[in-house]
Amino acid sequence: MLTAFTAGLLLITVSELGDKTFFIAMILAMRYPRRWVLVGVVGGLAAMTILSVLMGQIFTFLPTRYINYAEVALFLIFGTKLLWDARRIKATANLEEMEDAEKAIASGEKKLKIVPRGWGIVVESFALTFVAEWGDRTQIATIALAASNNAWGVSAGAILGHTICAVIAVMGGKFVAGRISEKTVTLIGGLLFYLFAVVSWWTKIA
């Protein structure tokens, strides 16, 4: 049986590898000192996770049965979308994600106008990461998990998953990106969402 911690950890680790946030962290780490980038990126991801968990807790006043049905439905929708996307992903998908990340960084730097030194790098990394994660499927999935599972477990698992992906992106992102198949990662992500849907149905509804 998947615990809240394990669910959060698996969900984030699989979903975040090779996405836009991953490439934002990788590109920033190639421009600035890695330690400052890592602090900012992990901070932004942790803040988004905590906010998502709090948003999930808001829905706990609803009847548990409705929350459980909504959780299963969301996992099925996300799983289906990811499997559909996996069929259509091109061989150049990673390059497209990197281009999107570069555009997001360029746009963010124009708006922020922060001196790229020390804590300025932390603030830039934090802001770019937080904005990139807003509305992302992992944020919505985290909200769904937190609505019907232990909030502390979901938070700890999701933050650890984000940290693992951030460390990989910052320390060896370029090396890893060349070896990650977005099609494979997306396919695994879709199957994982289906697994969550089945487990949630079996343990909470059936």
Swiss-Prot record:
One biological process term in Gene Ontology: calcium ion transport
Keyword 4Fe-4S part of the UniProt annotation: no
PANTHER family given in the database record: TRANSMEMBRANE PROTEIN 165 (PTHR12608:SF1), TRANSMEMBRANE PROTEIN HTP-1 RELATED (PTHR12608)
Molecular function (Gene Ontology), one example: metal ion transmembrane transporter activity
Domain of life per record: Bacteria
TM ranges: 36-56, 58-78, 114-134, 151-171, 185-205
Name listed for the protein in its UniProt record: GDT1-like protein sll0615
